[in-house]
Amino acid sequence: MGVQVETISPGDGRTFPKRGQTCVVHYTGMLEDGKKFDSSRDRNKPFKFMLGKQEVIRGWEEGVAQMSVGQRAKLTISPDYAYGATGHPGIIPPHATLVFDVELLKLE
């Protein structure tokens, strides 16, 4: 499957991230059963990453690149585009499909 992007609320439809730009996002990460494992919203601090530098899982690299500034989307990411057979011990089980609610706040 890779990554599936479903729009929750649209962005500007014009400003898409490019490799080397820093994406500033708010997100909530959940397992398929809806169990939350992480949220920048809970910390009240947006998360930043540079696109194309493998700072985040592949599902984010490809999913966020399809979003425009201001867009909020549900990213459903298969294990091979997330943490795979290893998972993230104590947080994400092996072979887990992940669901993220991501809002692209701005680009830097």
UniProtKB/Swiss-Prot annotation:
Domain PPIase FKBP-type: 20-108
Entry GO MF terms: activin receptor binding; calcium channel regulator activity; FK506 binding; I-SMAD binding; macrolide binding; peptidyl-prolyl cis-trans isomerase activity; signaling receptor inhibitor activity; transforming growth factor beta receptor binding
SUPFAM superfamilies registered for this protein in UniProt: FKBP-like
Residue numbers carrying N6-succinyllysine: K53
Gene Ontology BP annotations: 'de novo' protein folding; amyloid fibril formation; heart morphogenesis; heart trabecula formation; negative regulation of activin receptor signaling pathway; negative regulation of transforming growth factor beta receptor signaling pathway; positive regulation of canonical NF-kappaB signal transduction; protein folding
GO CC terms, sorted: cytoplasm; cytoplasmic side of membrane; cytosol; membrane; ryanodine receptor complex; sarcoplasmic reticulum; sarcoplasmic reticulum membrane; terminal cisterna
Coarse class of the protein's main subcellular location: cytoplasm
Catalytic activity: [protein]-peptidylproline (omega=180) = [protein]-peptidylproline (omega=0)
InterPro entries the UniProt entry points to: FKBP-type_PPIase (IPR050689), PPIase_dom_sf (IPR046357), PPIase_FKBP_dom (IPR001179)
Topology of this chain in the membrane: Peripheral membrane protein
Activity regulation behaviour: Inhibited by both FK506 and rapamycin.
Protein keywords: Acetylation, Cytoplasm, Isomerase, Membrane, Rotamase, Sarcoplasmic reticulum
Keyword Nuclease set for record: no
Enzyme Commission code(s) on record: 5.2.1.8
N6-acetyllysine: modified positions: K53
Enzyme class of the recorded protein, top EC level: isomerase
Gene3D superfamilies referenced in this protein's UniProt entry, alphabetically: 3.10.50.40
Segments forming a coiled coil: none
Location relative to the cell: Cytoplasm, Cytosol; Sarcoplasmic reticulum membrane
Entries under PROSITE patterns matching the protein: FKBP_PPIASE
Function according to Swiss-Prot or TrEMBL: Keeps in an inactive conformation TGFBR1, the TGF-beta type I serine/threonine kinase receptor, preventing TGF-beta receptor activation in absence of ligand. Recruits SMAD7 to ACVR1B which prevents the association of SMAD2 and SMAD3 with the activin receptor complex, thereby blocking the activin signal. May modulate the RYR1 calcium channel activity. PPIases accelerate the folding of proteins. It catalyzes the cis-trans isomerization of proline imidic peptide bonds in oligopeptides.
Subunit text: Interacts with TGFBR1; prevents TGFBR1 phosphorylation by TGFBR2 and stabilizes it in the inactive conformation. Interacts with ACVR1B and SMAD7. Identified in a complex composed of RYR1, PDE4D, PKA, FKBP1A and protein phosphatase 1 (PP1). Interacts directly with RYR2 and RYR3. Interacts with GLMN; rapamycin and FK506 abolish the interaction with GLMN in a dose dependent manner. Interacts directly with RYR1.
Family (UniProt): Belongs to the FKBP-type PPIase family. FKBP1 subfamily.
PANTHER family: PEPTIDYL-PROLYL CIS-TRANS ISOMERASE, PEPTIDYL-PROLYL CIS-TRANS ISOMERASE FKBP1A-RELATED
Name this protein carries in UniProt: Peptidyl-prolyl cis-trans isomerase FKBP1A
Species lineage: Eukaryota, Metazoa, Chordata, Craniata, Vertebrata
Gene: FKBP1A
